[in-house]
Amino acid sequence: MRPAIPFSYPGIDADIARLGSLLPLGLRAAEWAPPAAPAILNLACGRADETGVLLDVLAPLGAARFYLGIDLRDPEIAEARARWPAAPMGPGGVAEIEFRVGDASKPGTTGLLPDFDFIFVRHQNFWHEPEAWNRLYRRALTALKPGGRLAITSYFEREHELARACLLQLGAAAVADLPHPQSRRLTDAPGKSVDRRLALFRLPEDGPRLAPIGSPPTAAHRTTPEPSRPISSGRALPRAGPAQPESGASPRMSALHTVGQLG
């Protein structure tokens, strides 16, 4: 799927093309194939530059049932809407593409939505707001269909490990973790590069134990699974948070506030 308007910064086209090669490797490593008409959630999506490649990889016949991107910032969501209008994508029909402003780390809803087959968080920002990202990941896991996959990419090795540990404590099972050998180095921070690591997670067979939002986490909530419970369709989905600014890559914000000036 081609963008309706050009990307905002030099280098993004090549970054997205490389992500399009990395994602299929991750899906194969995770031993997962998307359903014929997947529902896809892109959390803390910023300008959502990766929308086209997500739809190309996960719904190559244009049969995505629903694609939703959520971010805290109005300007970035406005740009995403302009770049990725809903349009015929192939013999499968028309993908329903939507972008919303919201913060998934906080209580609140953006309306009744289905559960999702694939949830993506690109360039997660765990170490800027660990508590907020803990809440965001918890909400993401409650929105994930049984058998679905949650994927994250990271700028930094250490931040990737922190996010991975958080998801494991929440009850997610790690199914793949790939370094990106062609990751483009960024110069605004040491050791930072575009989509440096890709990790995929699933719900455990009997479902993660998730404490209600706002309740103090206990050891059981952090580590112990409980018997399976249904994840109902039509749940009111929480709103997504932002991530950290980037140099020449799609900007993200932390889940609670802007970190620096985006450019």
Residue positions per predicted region:
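Class I S-adenosyl-L-methionine
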Residues: 169-224, 257
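Glycine-rich SAM-binding Motif I of class I
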Residues: 48-52
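Conserved beta-strand signature within the Rossmann-like core of class I S-adenosyl-L-methionine
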Residues: 147-154
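Class I SAM-dependent methyltransferase SAM/SAH-binding core
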Residues: 53-98, 103
